[in-house]
């Protein structure tokens, strides 16, 4: 862990990352890619020491309320968060100033902040996004070793459902030769249906590899799945997008099951939903802002 002084905190689309780097150890993580210009070891978490001060200033200056997001680059609920509490402080500001909130995570540590998530959702809108990659617990522990298992995340989704907090699931990535099976996709969607997820984001059945994360991913394949790296190299070479050989069949299954369960599966529609700010008046009615 090391501290830096940040110049700003909110992106043009009102996203923020309170930390840079991660200790969850997911073998496929795109954030390891060199294009993000991280000048420190990925596991050496960079903490923006003035993030909360910057966020307060940014929120007070905004003329129009909107959704504030976090988690696109670094999961905010890393173990360090339980010590520093920056996400909770940010949530308190979001609630105080009447903004909406959405977060992407793989961790059940988010339940620490359930009270604030509920308060935000009662006042405006709060959406929790959670990544699910496999319904096989043993496989999950291999490819995502230091974070909540799929079953634990499923329990979080059901808890949020029971509290009236909407959820969106990212079905990503689908690793060729590892979790690209009908059984896996079907199992994940069954979980989404039971948890009453609003939607499932899926950009296709495959994964992307770039300089930086490719090397790490291949090292982990050698360690965990001997021989699979060679399958990747033979099949895909240096391609950026590595689409599963089962892609078309799996995408048909994905859309069919989402239709059956009434789960939104149009990515554009989901992103519009995530970015739409909703303010609840005293009568429980919604005012929706783009």
Task: Give the predicted meaning of each segment.
Residues 84-85, 118-130, 179-196, 221-224:
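Short, electropositive alpha-helical surface patch
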Residues 118-121, 154-162, 255, 259:
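Surface-exposed amphipathic alpha-helices with a cationic face
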Residues 47, 109-111, 176-179, 208:
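Acidic-and-aromatic substrate-binding clefts and catalytic sites of carbohydrate-active enzymes
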Residues 135-137, 144-146, 159-181, 204-207:
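Conserved strand-turn element in the central/C-terminal portion of the radical SAM core barrel
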Residues 1-129, 133-141, 150-154:
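Conserved Radical SAM active-site core
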Residues 98-99, 165, 197:
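A structural motif
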Residues 1-5, 183-290:
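Auxiliary Fe-S-binding modules of radical SAM enzymes
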